[in-house]
Design a protein with these regions (language model features):
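Conserved SAM-binding loop and adjacent beta-strand
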Residues: 1-7
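Conserved beta-strand signature within the Rossmann-like core of class I S-adenosyl-L-methionine
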Residues: 116-123
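Core SAM-dependent methyltransferase catalytic element
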Residues: 154-171
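Short alpha-helix
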Residues: 130-143
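A short glycine-rich, Lys/Arg-flanked "PGG" loop and its adjoining helix->strand segment in the class I
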Residues: 103-115
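A short SAM/SAH-binding and catalytic strip from SAM-dependent methyltransferases
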Residues: 87-100
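A short acidic, Gly/Pro-enriched loop at the edge of an enzyme's catalytic core
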Residues: 76-88
Length: 171
């Protein structure tokens, strides 16, 4: 199961010196590969989740990585500086955010990105369990992020999936 996650993280083209925010880290499957890549330089990873169970799980999974810190709570309530991250990762989590709160969360994530930073999002698009691609694009655009690239793919478990990269272009 690690290979698809590794390939996805490979698509980030990390040099090892980036500061990365993993929003909704859950079990740390993506986080582990990011932390590993960042060890080659002076990079750092921040893992955020609203679940204490997941934060404890990821801390155990990533205990050998000194370049990781963990934050428990809603991103809207956490003390995280704006313009602090080169990359924000949103992996299969946006559909778990209440619809009426999605724009607020995406706006906050966009503020956390440095100018020229990138937001990578992978999200199921099924009507019953996902976020439509058109909604994802609208959320990102409203937050001031510009689509660099995107594609639709298929996952055995999640069905149709949107993969996108959005840039924070300074005004």
């Amino acid at each position: 199961m690690a290979r698809p996650y590794r390939r996805y993280v490979d698509s980030f083209d990390l040099t090892g010196n980036e500061v990365v925010l993993d929003y909704g880290s859950v079990s740390g499957r993506i986080s582990r590969h990011i932390a590993e890549r960042l060890l080659s330089g002076k990079g750092h990873l921040t893992c955020i989740d609203v679940s204490n169970v997941w934060i404890e799980t990821i801390q155990k999974r990533l205990k050998k990585y000194p370049n990781v810190d963990y934050k428990l709570g809603d991103i809207a309530a956490l003390d995280i500086a704006d313009n602090a991250y080169d990359i924000v990762v949103v992996h299969f989590v946006l559909h778990h955010v209440e619809e009426d709160q999605r724009q607020e969360k995406v706006d906050i994530l966009a503020r956390k990105l440095r100018p020229h930073g990138r937001l990578f999002i992978r999200e199921p698009t099924r009507e019953q369990h996902g976020t439509p691609a058109v909604e994802i694009r609208a959320l990102m655009s409203t937050a001031g992020l510009h689509e660099r690239e995107s594609r639709m793919s298929r996952s055995l478990i999640m069905g149709e999936v949107f993969d996108g990269v959005f840039d924070k272009t300074p005004v």
